[in-house]
Amino acid sequence: MQAGGGGDAGDTRGRHRIQAELKKLEQEARFLEEELEELDKTDKVSAALQELMVTAESKADPLLPVTTGPACQSWDRWFEGPQDLRRCKCWFL
C-alpha cells in the first residue's frame, strides 16, 4: 500500500497500458488476417499470370526484328573487344 493514495493512479496507468497493448495485438491480428486473405487470392492470380506468361513467351515480339545474326558484318568490329590487348590504347579496357 502506498502513502498518499497514489495506488489508484498506478492501477489506472497499468490498466491503460494493458488496454493499449491489447489494442495493438488486435490490430496486428487484423493485419495478419488481411494478409492471409490476400494470399488466398494470390493463388488465382498466380495461375492466371502463369498462363499469360506461357502465351506471351510463345509469340515473337512484333517490335523486334527477327534475325539469326548481325544485320551487317562490318558493324561487329565496333562491339568486339580488341584482338591484342597490349596494343590497345583504350582507357576503359
Curated annotation (Swiss-Prot):
SMART domains to which the protein is assigned, alphabetical:
G_gamma (SM01224)
Determine if Transmembrane is one of this entry's keywords. Answer: no
Designated name of the protein: Guanine nucleotide-binding protein subunit gamma 1
Tell me, in a sentence or two, what this protein's role is. Guanine nucleotide-binding proteins (G proteins) are involved as modulators or transducers in various transmembrane signaling systems.
GO cellular component, alphabetical, reads: plasma membrane; side of membrane
Tell whether S-adenosyl-L-methionine is among the UniProt keywords.
no
Q: Which UniProt keywords apply?
A: Cell membrane, Coiled coil, Glycoprotein, GPI-anchor, Lipoprotein, Membrane, Methylation, Palmitate, Prenylation, Transducer
Q: Which residues form the propeptide?
A: 91-93
Record membrane topology? Lipid-anchor; GPI-anchor
Parts forming coiled coils: 12-52
Primary location recorded for the protein, binned into one broad class? membrane
Native source organism of the sequence: Oryza sativa subsp. indica
The region annotated as signal peptide is none
Could you list the residues that carry lipid attachment of the S-farnesyl cysteine kind.
90
Q: Where in the cell is it found?
A: Cell membrane
* Superkingdom of this protein's organism: Eukaryota
